[in-house]
């Protein structure tokens, strides 16, 4: 697969999964716009030659549109979007706060919608949008209500947008990872079997495929990527 001449925007690009996706796309020859709420990545060298766009609040539709307009102008267009930006919260309903539900919606659903709307102003027919849902949203566990509900929203959004864009040949799909092997997750679950978790590079490989021409017949799919969890 080659992405020479194609520009792909990746949100949440400064985190563990985002960095893996940026690296995989650069290896395939893509021009990558790495977008994040953080002003700068902790490890800029890990993002290679990606064009860094820090300090972008993707929950702010106007700021998001402005960022994507700049990206498209700088690179002569946009061919794909990978929505990784998001967050997690563990909180039981009875003792929790409704503010957590609002925060999860803002971080997981609103960011994906705002970025997709902004990208669609520039995506050509045949473009690609990839979202990140969650296998834990298929059946939520205790303490997962707000997070799972927000990721379910991402999944329903994926299906709806895929239907809306079929006529343009723009595919919209989502991956449903289980636990991703990141430093933060290892710190939160130090006694877990890390070898069973999904590696960021494995998710990146699936994303690269869904962005490619070989995946042109796949749209509206919710793809489990669960490792051995």
What label would you give each PLM region?
Residues 14:
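Conserved glycine-rich cofactor-binding loop
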Residues 84-90:
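Conserved NAD(P)H cofactor-binding loop of Rossmann-fold oxidoreductase domains
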Residues 92-93, 97-102:
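Substrate-binding pocket helix/loop in short-chain dehydrogenase/reductase
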Residues 116, 150:
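Active-site helix of classical SDR
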Residues 121, 163-167:
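Alpha-helical segment proximal to the catalytic Tyr-Lys
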Residues 134:
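Residue(s) in the substrate-gating loop at a strand-loop-helix junction
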Residues 167, 174, 182, 192-229:
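C-terminal helical subdomain
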